[in-house]
Curated annotation (Swiss-Prot):
Residues 1-33, 337-353 are cytoplasmic. Its main location: membrane. GO terms for biological process: positive regulation of protein exit from endoplasmic reticulum. This is Cell cycle control protein 50B. It comes from Mus musculus. The lineage of its organism: Eukaryota, Metazoa, Chordata, Craniata, Vertebrata. The gene is Tmem30b. GO terms for cellular component: phospholipid-translocating ATPase complex; plasma membrane. Belongs to the CDC50/LEM3 family. Residues 55-315 are exoplasmic loop. Pfam families: CDC50. Keywords: Cell membrane, Glycoprotein, Lipid transport, Membrane, Transmembrane, Transmembrane helix, Transport. The keyword Cell inner membrane does not apply. Glycans are attached at residues 213, 286.
Amino acid sequence: MTWSATARGAHQPDNTAFTQQRLPAWQPLLSAGIALPLFFCAGLAFIGLGLGLFYSSNGIKELEYDYTGNPGTGDCSVCAAKGQGRAPPPGCACSWSFTLPELFPGPVYLYYELSNFYQNNRRYGVSRDDAQLSGLASALRHPANECAPYQFRSDGLPIAPCGAIANSLFNDSFSLWHQRQPSDPFVEVPLDRTAIAWWTDYHVKFRNPPLVNGSLALAFRGTAPPPNWHRPVYELSPDPNNTGFINQDFVVWMRTAALPTFRKLYARIRQGNYSAGLPRGTYRVNITYNYPVRAFGGHKLIILSNISWMGGKNPFLGIAYLVVGSLCIVMGFVMLVVYIRYQDQDDDDNDDE
């Protein structure tokens, strides 16, 4: 068989400008007249965006209270002392009182914050069974091996929901009360606990197993709750649309955080007389203290915050834009000085020639 340079092989591409990489190309020549305006314009744009983001973040109001219960920090220290690093006795309660001299504009969001809690630990992050959480009946009885040691109870019953993430579910609870005048009684502020989880989590990723004779409790028969839970998953809420694997608090907790200090949404305040925000007056947050954090050196906070078009309070993004914009301006001036200095030398060299 003779070989021909023009013969097309089985794997030879078409003889086109695209496949043979003969398309026309253009490469800009970055002269000083082009590069310097680009640096200055980019710097001004970044600084403008940074100022807008920073101003918007500073306009967000926040109230926070550390109720970890360190000695001498209020009545929550009594609950923390009773637990001695573990969960305190059931029903231990404390409170936080504060006064608002003016309207706290809404919409107002209630968060809890944990610190020194590494949900991003690999073994912790994979300790779950997504098939079980999606309501698959076979996974309910046979949890994934990743859930170990929270896969089966000591008597052999499968744990539902299994895994370390579910076992460490945050279980403090809060209620907010308002007193308009010193002589008035405290009135409970309605907390909207619905739609606090991501839409995709609540409607797609988390599903309850099929009901048995119309009962969710029968669907979970033959399973055990996680060791740290005081009640089974089907009793998380009396609302049938907010219990089991689709409980909003549970779904929010199961979306793990990337950093050791994180906030999770607990409720919105947007109903009745509080749709525009929190009116002035005295407020009291009643806290049911259940969750132990002192054993791992953590802290827990309750936070009231409103939001802006960019979300919650986060000055980092605005500061980052300001830093990048300032660096662009500084580098532009440095290159301008270098250009002016060495341009004169080039002109002198050309005159000598």
